[in-house]
């Protein structure tokens, strides 16, 4: 067996011991390798934190530009000498997760298409931007569910997701 195969096999055995693996294993599009990529960079849930702490770490928070536009932070928009406030590997790995969720065409893909269709109607001038916005909203929903499942698996009473706790929404899309 070559080094790559041995490494993957070891990675699969380790991720299956992770507290959130039973939940992740039910998500269409998430396998041991994809889960390992993601879980290797995420901190364990805490009672005083919510999934928004993961959003911040991945740079999935919205900023306002000088032109009044909303967007996610990007390296090519940093001022000279300014440091990123997010971890680029987390975002890259979440992009891989999102691509896998899209290819699997499960619950999260359905959510993505609903959001994208709504954005096309609400913002017909956005053209290619609707994919990006819907994609990262899908990732954030997945992260909220993952955070909740992981906290529950460890017996932690995690905070409610931001849309419920702060914005006063009554429900959030659930996968199962």
Name each region found by the language model.
Residues 1-33:
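Helix-hairpin-helix/helix-loop-helix acidic hairpins
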């Amino acid at each position: 067996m070559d080094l790559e195969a041995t490494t993957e096999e070891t990675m699969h055995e380790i991720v299956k011991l992770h507290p959130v693996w039973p939940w992740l294993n039910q998500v269409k599009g998430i396998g041991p390798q994809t889960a390992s990529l993601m879980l290797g960079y995420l901190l364990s849930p805490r009672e005083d934190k919510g999934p928004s702490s993961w959003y911040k770490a991945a740079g999935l928070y919205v900023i306002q530009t000088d032109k009044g536009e909303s967007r996610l932070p990007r390296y090519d928009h940093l001022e000279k000498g300014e440091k990123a406030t997010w971890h680029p590997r987390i975002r890259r790995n979440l992009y891989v997760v999102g691509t896998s969720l899209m290819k699997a065409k499960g619950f999260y893909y359905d959510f993505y298409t609903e959001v994208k269709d709504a954005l096309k109607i609400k913002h017909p001038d956005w053209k290619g931007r609707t994919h990006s916005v819907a994609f990262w909203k899908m990732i954030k929903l997945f992260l909220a569910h993952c955070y909740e499942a992981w906290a529950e698996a460890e017996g932690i009473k995690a905070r409610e997701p931001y849309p419920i706790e702060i914005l006063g929404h009554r429900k959030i899309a659930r996968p199962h």
